[in-house]
């Protein structure tokens, strides 16, 4: 089974063209669930290694170019992934599935995208976010003040003075599983203003269950919250991710239009062996 590995801002994904729907029968014949398949392929050391896996499918509505199924590395399904969407668009563009302007279906709704620089840069228009809600949590006896917002998937944004001093794994995990966000939990972001149009972000991702090098919907959540709280004064907002890459977030004042732009890199093409299922 052929696949590509792509990454955007250090967020890496395995992408498979499954428009012929052969994967379902392949897994059924071998008694492997799709969740187990994803976990095995995304596993580092014994699999390809990735933050998530994307299946490109035929669209339900012929007006759209394709539909995707997105899985976190633990096999769970996610409604949306900003960086994953940019990687999916580059894959579809290079495979001749789409042109420079793209519409594709996700569980969060139809996503529009534009391709630049022969696929090396992709701009996606995300679905409008939920209304931001400030919340005060008690975590290990301490108050944590942040803002909850859904930018396709749920995010809790915590402004801090220095993101380098945050124990992202410990605090992020505690917030991710906090009773306030049950049963589905939330992604957790720590944001530090750098200048009037730039922020630095670190993210604990639900489904990956660790800090990731970047998160597109998380960067978007942080940019919106930072602007609304006056931590930055100008748009578009530049987001410095853990990978060192910069994501650019722009949005209308009423938040009905939200755009995420960044570079996408093709890492390699490969073919999965059936032996990956043995681990």
Curated annotation (Swiss-Prot):
Its EC number is 5.1.1.7. Catalyzes the stereoinversion of LL-2,6-diaminopimelate (L,L-DAP) to meso-diaminopimelate (meso-DAP), a precursor of L-lysine and an essential component of the bacterial peptidoglycan. SUPFAM superfamilies: Diaminopimelate epimerase-like. The active site is at 81 (proton donor), 215 (proton acceptor). Pfam families: DAP_epimerase. The record marks 155, 205 as: Could be important to modulate the pK values of the two catalytic cysteine residues. This is Diaminopimelate epimerase. GO terms for biological process: lysine biosynthetic process via diaminopimelate. Homodimer. PANTHER family: DIAMINOPIMELATE EPIMERASE, DIAMINOPIMELATE EPIMERASE, CHLOROPLASTIC. GO terms for molecular function: diaminopimelate epimerase activity. Substrate binds at residues 11, 72, 82-83, 187, 205-206, 216-217. It comes from Aquifex aeolicus (strain VF5). It is an enzyme of class 5 (isomerase). Pathway: Amino-acid biosynthesis; L-lysine biosynthesis via DAP pathway; DL-2,6-diaminopimelate from LL-2,6-diaminopimelate: step 1/1. Belongs to the diaminopimelate epimerase family. It catalyses: (2S,6S)-2,6-diaminopimelate = meso-2,6-diaminopimelate.
């Amino acid at each position: 089974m052929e696949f590509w590995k792509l990454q955007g801002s250090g967020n890496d994904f395995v992408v498979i063209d499954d428009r012929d729907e052969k994967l379902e029968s392949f897994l059924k014949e071998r008694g492997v669930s799709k969740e187990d398949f994803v976990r095995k392929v995304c596993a580092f050391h014994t699999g390809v290694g990735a933050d998530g896996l994307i299946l490109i499918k035929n669209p339900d509505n012929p007006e759209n170019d394709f539909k995707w199924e997105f899985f976190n590395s633990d096999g769970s399904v996610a409604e949306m992934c900003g960086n994953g969407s940019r990687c999916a668009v580059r894959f579809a563009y290079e495979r001749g599935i789409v042109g420079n302007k793209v519409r594709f279906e996700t569980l969060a709704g139809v996503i529009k995208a534009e391709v630049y620089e022969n696929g090396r840069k992709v701009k996606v228009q995300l679905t409008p976010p939920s209304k931001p809600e400030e919340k005060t949590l008690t975590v290990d006896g301490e108050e944590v003040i942040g803002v909850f917002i859904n930018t396709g998937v749920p995010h809790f944004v915590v402004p801090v003075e220095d993101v380098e001093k945050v124990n992202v794994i410990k605090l992020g995990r505690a917030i991710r599983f906090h009773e306030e966000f049950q049963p589905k939990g939330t992604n957790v972001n720590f944001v530090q203003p750098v200048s009037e149009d730039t922020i630095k972000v670190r993210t604990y991702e639900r489904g990956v269950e660790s800090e990731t090098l970047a998160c597109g919907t998380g960067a978007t959540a942080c940019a919106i919250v930072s602007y609304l709280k006056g931590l930055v004064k100008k748009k578009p907002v530049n987001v410095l991710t853990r990978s060192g890459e910069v994501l650019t977030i722009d949005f209308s004042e009423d938040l009905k239009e939200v755009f995420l732009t960044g570079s996408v890199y093709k890492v390699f093409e490969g073919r999965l062996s059936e032996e990956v299922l043995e681990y």
